[in-house]
Each structure stands twice: as C-alpha cells, then as structure tokens.
C-alpha cells in the first residue's frame, strides 16, 4: 500500500492503486511492446480490486488537457488492442463499477475523489498537461456535470519526475493549480521517479525505452 494514497483509501467503496515497476518484465523496448508485456499484470490488478476488465476505462493520453466522461464517451481501439477514449488525458465519472486508469513514466498522475458522492477522476499531468491546467479543467467539468464542490474534493499527486532530474518543476505548479481551483485537501507523494529506478519507470532516465506505471481509481457498489 502506497502511503500517499492513504487519504483516498479512507473513502468507503473507493478503490485506488499505483502499480510500480514490475521487476521480472523486461521493458527496454518500444512503448506498445512494453505495454503488451505489462498488460497481464495490469489486468490482474484491475480484477484484484474487484472490477471486471470489460469495465476498464483508459485515456488515449496525447499530452493535452481534454477530459473524457468514462461510461459515456465513445471509445476507439488503441495500438495495444485495448479501448481508449480518444484525444483525452483525463477521465472523470460518477458511475460505480468502472475502473479508470492512466499510465505514466515521469509525468504526474492526479487522483480526484469527492467523499460526499461517487464522483472521481484520474488525470495525466506532465509538462504540457500542467501548462494547460488539466487539473483546473477537470474540476470545472466535475462542477458542470456533477455539481461537485471543489472544497469537498481530495486530490493526490503521485510520484513524478522533479528537479534536479528535470528542469521543470511541474509538481509545484500542480500544487498551485489545486489551490487556485479551490481544492482544500491536496496531497503530494513528494517522490521523484527518476531517482528510484528499482521502483519506477523513468522515460527520461531510460531514454524512452521503458514501461509505464499504472494508476487506478474506481468505486465498487455497496452490496
């Protein structure tokens, strides 16, 4: 259990995960092949959390700031053979029973959840996504679509690349954006992916030939 996810793991019926490097899977190949090799392990995590793999929602992740509505928006088949919502770098939903996932290897991933409702989200916020304030956009979409109050949200930033291993401190910018969006409960893993390769994949340190960590959020309907 990652300590930085603890604030989210206190929410009943919410499930979260962050799958780090899988040591026995060689990933010094191109992205699609690395993801193919990691897929059985990632699928097992989704199912271990109580979700059907047929209810697994992913974003295409194009380093932008568009947000998809999981369970509503249409999907396409990605290069790795699994469905994604095209053109988006974030997913939000209020539907229970869906598993949302984002892949990262230095970029930031942001978990969002409202303990007073079933509203949740997962965002890919690297240099470009942070510049475009994907977090602020996600909060506005939650307000518009679900009536979410920003002050009720819990936001968590996972491990990501940070100075001195990267010249842009986008983690600090994300913290500022959370405050500006009205988020009062913000938590940062304060961990650099490039400084701990036994635990994390790092696109920069491994020159692009590496795997991806998988972040997950979803809500299990009460029995």
Task: Label the predicted regions.
Residues 1-223:
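Active-site microenvironment for binding and transforming phosphate-containing groups
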